[in-house]
Amino acid sequence: MAAANAPIAMREALTLTSLGIAPQFVTFTHVTMESEKYICVRETSPQNSVVIVDMAMPAQPLRRPITADSALMNPNTRILALKAQIPGTTQDHLQIFNIEAKTKIKSHQMPEQVVFWKWITPKLLGLVTQTSVYHWSIEGDSEPAKMFDRTANLANNQIINYRCDPSEKWLVLIGIAPGAPERPQLVKGNMQLFSVDQQRSQALEAHAASFASFKVVGNENPSTLICFASKTTNAGQITSKLHVIELGAQPGKPGFSKKQADLFFPPDFQDDFPVAMQISQKYGLIYVITKLGLLFVYDLETAAAVYRNRISPDPIFLTAESSASGGFYAINRRGQVLHATVNDATIVPFVSSQLNNLELAVNLAKRANLPGAENLVVQRFQELFAQTKYKEAAELAAESPQGLLRTPETVAKFQSVPVQAGQTPPLLQYFGTLLTRGKLNAYESLELSRLVVNQNKKNLLENWLAEDKLECSEELGDLVKTVDNDLALKIYIKARATPKVVAAFAERREFDKILIYSKQVGYTPDYLFLLQTILRTDPQGAVNFALMMSQMEGGCPVDYNTITDLFLQRNMIREATAFLLDVLKPNLPEHAFLQTKVLEINLVTYPNVADAILANGMFSHYDRPRVAQLCEKAGLYLRALQHYTELPDIKRVMVNTHAIEPQALVEFFGTLSREWALECMKDLLLVNLRGNLQIVVQAAKEYSEQLGVDACIKLFEQFKSYEGLYFFLGAYLSSSEDPDIHFKYIEAAARTGQIKEVERVTRESNFYDAEKTKNFLMEAKLPDARPLINVCDRFGFVPDLTHYLYTNNMLRYIEGYVQKVNPGNAPLVVGQLLDDECPEDFIKGLILSVRSLLPVEPLVDECEKRNRLRLLTQFLEHLVSEGSQDVHVHNALGKIIIDSNNNPEHFLTTNPFYDSRVVGKYCEKRDPTLAVVAYRRGQCDDELINVTNKNSLFKLQARYVVERMDGDLWDKVLQPENEYRRQLIDQVVSTALPESKSPEQVSAAVKAFMTADLPHELIELLEKIVLQNSAFSGNFNLQNLLILTAIKADPSRVMDYVNRLDNFDGPAVGEVAVEAQLFEEAFAIFKKFNLNVQAVNVLLDNIRSIERAEEFAFRVEEDAVWSQVAKAQLREGLVSEAIESFIRADDATHFLDVIRAAEEANVYDDLVKYLLMVRQKAREPKVDGELIFAYAKIDRLSDIEEFILMPNVANLQNVGDRLYDEELYEAAKIIYAFISNWAKLAVTLVKLKQFQGAVDAARKANSAKTWKEVCFACVDAEEFRLAQICGLNIIVQVDDLEEVSEYYQNRGCFNELISLMESGLGLERAHMGIFTELGVLYARYRPEKLMEHIKLFSTRLNIPKLIRACDEQQHWKELTYLYIQYDEFDNAATTIMNHSPDAWDHMQFKDVAVKVANVELYYKAVHFYLQEHPDLINDLLNVLALRLDHTRVVDIMRKAGQLHLVKPYMVAVQSNNVSAVNEALNELYVEEEDYERLRESVDMHDNFDQIGLAQKLEKHELLEMRRIAAYIYKKAGRWKQSIALSKKDNMYKDCMETCSQSGDRELSEDLLVYFIEQGKKECFASCLFICYDLIRADVALELAWMNNMVDFAFPYLLQFIREYTSKVDELVKDRIESQNEVRAKEKEEKDLVAQQNMYAQLLPLALPAPPGMGGPPPPMGMPGMPPMGGMGMPPMGPGPMPAYGMPPMGSY
């Protein structure tokens, strides 16, 4: 049977290996396919990854680096489930990821190993362990729930499938196990069926199973079926069965009877068995797929066999249902993903004809709506109808495939059946059956509705429409409209009968719905007519409708202006305004006219509305001058101002300030330019200065920045309006810092009598010119002096103020200023009054009136400057008596006492309130000792130092410095720059410190000397204190300081101090001595204080005497000392001595350093002793490892063997690696053998030349790297047998193959390498690389075997690589074959042509040429054949005919002079009508004088130079050639040349035919004259008939009569008269019919107008027809009334409705 006619269609959806997936990963354990959407492949090399193949985009696989033991893609969504075993346990870790969201959904750690898992639903995972089955939902946080335990029959089975039914009530688990002993090749299948409701299991034998749903006749609920296939042996007999069984039968309902059928396996497939089963719910078929690729197809309902075939030559291990196509996907071991589907066009004919199962064929066709059973269904229907089984016939018709019987004929057949009384009519039975099955078609819906409407059962129609049982149509709507308009509207909408829907909405006055509906369906109603209709009854509704039109996509269908005019013609101003305001919101330039219009109509009728519109500012494109004029006329002066653009207009309108709100006018000023605004302000002041001043001031204040403050000031000054200036500058003052503005404001306020404001500004402002203001106020002589007082007080003009007030006899203001305003300035006032020679009594009274508020210091300064200090004695004593502690009071009093020499020492020592620095300074020139007293009392260090230095009072200075104990003071006096430092130090050492008994004072002095870096002076000081039996001789700190200072300043004294002093800090001082490199002193200190470790460190680290250190260590015998000695010996390279010292110290802490040093010194014997000591103290891997290494270095291998058998913590792997690296191979062998590191052992044995043992170890290691190392070593040693054993284990790894090959080739072992590769071909894991590499080797070294190898294994070769090898080795024939196999046809063709002696084969080249992509190769092939194989060139050209440019081919052949060679080719392609081909063939035909072929060519192919050919043929010697020339002229329209040529050759018939075809009357009549002239009467008669349509009758008769040829013209004359009379009769008949039609049309129009006028009184006034609508003019006497059509009024009576349910549209 041909594949095209097979009932099952197979195709290869994709190949996994083509996506880069290695063949070793195409297995059951690596590939999963849970549905038709995704394939998931788990790769483990070169790295762990998961490849997800989306079947919708198979060429774009998603590869992610994921390590897992198994991966499953969710059947529906991009959710990935991963399973991985936890290392070291039998537990599995499960994770679920959302790939799109890149988030983890859930994870769980299973306590058992999951041996199989599967998505049983899109939300549920089934997990199978060794003992149980769990379900795990991806929703929520639930953990896997146990469902049931595995039965015993599944023990030791490999689980291959797990499924559940759609209700998740039935579960089935499938496993396979090795076959029975008598037939081990046949695998056993076991199945466990579990009921969730009953919690029971049943064990069965089956290899594959699946669930299905099936509706049994008489049962509305579907039955759950299980289908399973088994293949068992019993007593040597093989039984293969398919079972279909119902699960959970429904009580009281018809059930599904159990079915079973045999599976027939061909003899060659006796050991084959089912591996998968898929059920197609779409077709009701069962697919059983076996391991070896057999497909069995069975009917689900009957278990009848439908089809069997082998679909795959390779074993199938995985399938998945394809619900979309009703088939399935299968994956075989080759990586092919096969897609099997039912062939809709052939399965039913196949079942009916091949299987002769007519019932099954009909059921399949009905079940899946398939073609092919038409005759059977129709025949069965007719039989049932003939048997009056109307119900069965109705059911058959309802279920007929592809609606075969759902036709009007079937309805008519049921209608024709007579109805028996008391019985349901067959037609209703038919419709009832259809309704239970689904939806009726349009015709059925219409017929059923007729019945229902006639019976007045409208509710049935409503129910059926609600249930979507009827197909809506316009005819159905028309029918229902007679009983229910609403229901009819719904039907029209569903049927998309747009005109009827619009008419219905118009009748219901739901105009808004018309717009919505029209937009939805893309219909365009008559919007203008609808708007006019609404206007008559609902003006607001009309506005809403117009607005809805304006919002339609694509713009408003009616012009806005037209809509506005409709409103205005009915005086609907408000409605027109509302419409325009809404549609003009976008404020577009093209709406300028409408903006002007809406403003005009409202300014005339409703100015307040216009004002509101303008206030909103929503328009900006209207005619502003026009609107401005209208606003002025309407009294809207502000709006007029806003719209005028000329200054005179603005001035004219602005003076109407009485009608303009002041604030608005002020705001208007903000829109004017600076110059215009100032002009307008000037006009306002000119017209009414007093009335408009406030507006002008407000405008000036508001826009001062734009107008300029100076300009505004000048404006007010121009009108001498100080009031305007006052108000204007008052607002601007707070933000201005201009002194001139502040002064002008003060001036304006003063001139307008605003004294309080003048006082406030002078008090608060910081920006006026004080000098200028002071002068103005003094000149103004205001009655109130407070403004002047403010200015002078703030800006320091107090003397001027005092002088002004004193000279103007304003003493009251002086007292007020001093007492109340600013008592602090009283000293200045007093000073000025003294200068003005004011009486002392007034001044004293003034001072006493202020008293404590008066600042004493400046007052004293003022009086002191004028030598009037005694004036203050009474005042100061009064303050003291009042208890004043003011320092200035007491300073002044002290100065008076010092000057009067009234016991000043008593005052200086007892008065606590004076300032020592001030009084001391006052005393310096009078008595320095008094100054010292004052400075000491106030601790005035600098002043005291200066005065004592100046007066050589160093003893006083030394005592003061020691007593002060101030570090800063000490630093100051001990500075090198101090020229008196030596005198001070002498007084300190000799007098001040010896007198002191305070340790603090001593300490401060010592510290000061140290800080000042005076070590020698400090030693002098300390010796005097410490060594001379003073109170501080035994002081610990001073002894430390003395030694440390000596270390720093005089090291020669240190040893003496160390010996003489005992109470100092030995460790610290010793460290300082070390730092100062006084090593012997430091050793003496440490030894004195028994610090042995520090002492020995000095000997080792500083003195560097290991001998003295050893001697010292023997003397003290301390472990710590020996340890220090050992470390020093180690540093100096005395390794053996260091090891002995470490052993004496019993110190194991530095074993790493000891090991390193011992290895460098190669003293492994001593190291062994040390390490044995260390092992007694610590268990360190490093120690044990080094001990083994040391044993190896001194060749104590037996000790190594003994040691590793003992408990140890050595890292033997690392030790072995180190031994190997150090080439201690015998010791390394012991270690590697002990730890079973076969890989390293193998390499070690190689180094020992023990190759056989190395191979054995490599076999145990089974590592690619190890195999390579052993292999390469064997090759180098020419142990090729062993090398081949290793090589076979390497070359199965793709990545290592090339390395092995190169190694062999580099050493010239070509034969051995070929032998290795040939052996590798038979390996189970042989891959493409082996076959390819062997091909490359054949190409290089055995070319005679190359072609055989390529042909045998072409599908398993890496062809590009082999192509390169063949190209390099110049094997052209093999290279061509490879190019063809790789679909590189361009390269194949090029190779054949370039190397034709070796590679050319005609048949092969033809096959290649038709597949070439590069067009230029076609023409290269033509040249090639022309040069080397001209006899075969036509064969090649015919093959390439569809791809060649025939013009170019002809040019090639023409240039080569070989056109005749390709004549067969040109004939074959001439049908393309190519100019070059036609001309070449015509040229050959002319050359061969083949006029028949030439005529045929010219006739059929017109694309050539016709005139050129004609001119060439015109002179040909053959007549037929010249006739062809005439013929060509005729075809080209050159009638005269054609006729002349025919006349020349006496071809009169040709002449006549040419004239007839030309349509030229003159040529025809000239030809008649020619025939008369030649006496050709018969030709004359023939020409009259042939040119009948061209020749005029009068000309013909005239020529005949004049030349006595009337008899020859008479037949023409008879024909002409007959034709003429027939035409006249036709014209008369047409005229009569036309007149009748006109009269009938006029009568019809008259009747229509009369009928329309019957309703004229019911219709409101309407606008005249818009231009272009083509309506008739209004009737007489009623201007503006259109004809009465088109207003939505249907005609009365039962007459037929016009189209679309609307009357003729009349004017609209």
From Swiss-Prot:
It comes from Oryza sativa subsp. japonica (Rice). Residues 315-343 are annotated as: WD40-like repeat 7. Residues 537-1708 are annotated as: Heavy chain arm. The C-terminal third of the heavy chains forms the hub of the triskelion. This region contains the trimerization domain and the light-chain binding domain involved in the assembly of the clathrin lattice. The N-terminal seven-bladed beta-propeller is formed by WD40-like repeats, and projects inward from the polyhedral outer clathrin coat. It constitutes a major protein-protein interaction node. Clathrin triskelions, composed of 3 heavy chains and 3 light chains, are the basic subunits of the clathrin coat. GO terms for cellular component: clathrin coat of coated pit; clathrin coat of trans-Golgi network vesicle; clathrin complex. Keywords: Coated pit, Cytoplasmic vesicle, Membrane, Repeat. Residues 1564-1708 are annotated as: Trimerization. The lineage of its organism: Eukaryota, Viridiplantae, Streptophyta, Embryophyta, Tracheophyta. SUPFAM superfamilies: ARM repeat, Clathrin heavy-chain terminal domain. GO terms for biological process: intracellular protein transport; receptor-mediated endocytosis. Residues 1227-1536 are annotated as: Involved in binding clathrin light chain. This is Clathrin heavy chain 1. Clathrin is the major protein of the polyhedral coat of coated pits and vesicles. Residues 653-1708 are annotated as: Proximal segment. GO terms for molecular function: clathrin light chain binding; structural molecule activity. InterPro entries: ARM-type_fold, CHCR, Clathrin_H-chain/VPS_repeat, Clathrin_H-chain_linker_core, Clathrin_H-chain_N, Clathrin_H-chain_propeller_rpt, Clathrin_heavy_chain, TPR-like_helical_dom_sf. Residues 25-67 are annotated as: WD40-like repeat 1. Residues 206-270 are annotated as: WD40-like repeat 5. Its main location: membrane. Residues 493-536 are annotated as: Flexible linker. Residues 1-492 are annotated as: Globular terminal domain. It is found in: Cytoplasmic vesicle membrane; Membrane, Coated pit. It comes from the Eukaryota. Belongs to the clathrin heavy chain family. Residues 462-478 are annotated as: Binding site for the uncoating ATPase, involved in lattice disassembly. Residues 537-648 are annotated as: Distal segment.
